[in-house]
């Protein structure tokens, strides 16, 4: 068994002395609290005074430690957990903190106190702490490079154009792929007015979503330009439109429907007012060639001009002819 060194023996003796003194002090404090006779002794009064001072100090520290940690300078009186040194004369303390909350009334009071101290200092010394700002104009170099002048003029013109141009109003643009939300007062009569829409493509009528009041607005279209004379039916190709037709529009075909195809009556979903076009989804051929609507679902009531019988109301049909279905029902 190894012998203990003198240092280790000294450490053990110090720990034993401290623990014995601590236990004796604790026993004495407990005896002062429990015994009324011992509480009259002066040493018990000293113990009570020390305990009250410790409780008050811990309460003050709890009020000052409010939801953040600070390292650096701050106004005194704020609630924080501080790691640093205090300057007793100045109302500043070590700050450098991560803060999660602050008592606003305390901060206002400290700011008022600081201002009052500055004003009292000015009145006592009759001096002003503020300095006058120099009004001397900065020297200008008349021999400026002409290229720099042109660059500055271009930059100024670009900022002015961005502010005054109504076409670049309230939008985000990324080349030709952009989103714009605004109105252009100069192009009110133009059908291709870029008003409140998102466009993805080169052609004004190609691959975009527009929301407006005119006939070609308030729809999402994915197709070709309808202005091409060669393809007349491309206007109704693969788009979804929600709007109203003009006064000269005899049919309600362009009203509140989603269509996917070249034939106006082929492969679409329509919701309108007329008897034939009211509240149904149709996937079939042109009704001009065959009166029986093929492969569709309809939910609604027929009008006065509706040639479809009442049996065709509110049904789902997947067949070739309505006569065959009637024969099946009669049989």
Swiss-Prot record:
GO CC aspect terms: extracellular region
Keyword field: Amidation, Cleavage on pair of basic residues, Neuropeptide, Repeat, Secreted, Signal
Lineage: Eukaryota, Metazoa, Spiralia, Lophotrochozoa, Mollusca
Pfam families hit by this protein: FARP
Source organism of the structure: Doryteuthis opalescens
Signal peptide from the UniProt entry: 1-25
Assigned protein family: Belongs to the FARP (FMRFamide related peptide) family.
One GO-annotated biological process of the protein: neuropeptide signaling pathway
Protein name: FMRFamide-related neuropeptides
Chain positions with Phenylalanine amide modification: 71, 83, 100, 174, 181, 200, 211, 222, 242, 260, 271, 283, 299, 318
Subcellular location: Secreted
Keyword Secreted: yes
Propeptide segment residues: 26-65, 86-94, 103-168, 184-194, 203-205, 214-216, 225-236, 245-254, 263-265, 274-277, 286-293, 302-312, 321-331
Region called Disordered, residue ranges: 122-158, 279-310
Function summary: Excitatory neurotransmitters that directly modulate chromatophore function by activating chromatophore expansion at the chromatophore neuromuscular junction.
Top-rank lineage group of the source organism: Eukaryota
Compositionally biased spans, kind Basic and acidic residues: 146-158, 279-296
């Amino acid at each position: 068994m190894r012998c203990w060194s003198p240092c280790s023996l000294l450490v053990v003796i110090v720990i034993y002395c401290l623990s014995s003194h601590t236990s004796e002090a604790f026993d004495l404090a407990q005896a002062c609290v429990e015994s009324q006779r011992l509480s009259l002794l002066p040493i018990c009064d000293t113990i009570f005074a020390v305990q009250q001072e410790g409780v008050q100090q811990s309460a003050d520290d709890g009020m000052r430690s409010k939801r953040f940690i600070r390292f650096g300078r701050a106004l005194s009186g704020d609630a924080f957990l501080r790691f640093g040194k205090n300057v007793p004369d100045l109302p500043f303390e070590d700050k450098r903190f991560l803060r999660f909350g602050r008592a606003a009334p305390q901060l206002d009071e400290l700011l008022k106190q600081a201002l009052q101290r500055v004003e009292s200092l000015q009145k006592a010394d009759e001096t002003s702490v503020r300095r006058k700002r120099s009004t001397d104009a900065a020297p200008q170099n008349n021999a400026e490079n002409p290229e720099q002048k042109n660059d500055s003029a271009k930059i100024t013109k670009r900022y002015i154009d961005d502010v005054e141009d109504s076409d670049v109003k309230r939008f985000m643009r990324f080349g030709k792929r952009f989103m714009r939300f605004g109105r252009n007062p100069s192009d009110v009569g133009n059908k291709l007015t870029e008003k409140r829409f998102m466009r993805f493509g080169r052609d004004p009528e190609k691959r975009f979503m527009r929301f407006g009041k005119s006939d070609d607005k308030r729809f999402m279209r994915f197709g070709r330009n309808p202005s091409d004379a060669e393809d007349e039916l491309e206007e109704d190709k693969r788009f979804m439109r929600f709007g109203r037709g003009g006064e000269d529009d005899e049919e309600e075909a362009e009203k509140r429907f989603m269509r996917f195809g070249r034939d106006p009556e082929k492969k679409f979903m329509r919701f309108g007012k007329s008897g034939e076009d009211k509240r149904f989804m149709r996937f079939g051929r042109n009704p001009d060639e065959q009166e029986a609507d093929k492969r569709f679902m309809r939910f609604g009531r027929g009008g006065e001009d509706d040639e479809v019988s009442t049996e065709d109301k509110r049904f789902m049909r997947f067949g070739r002819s309505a006569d065959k279905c009637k024969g099946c029902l009669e049989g």
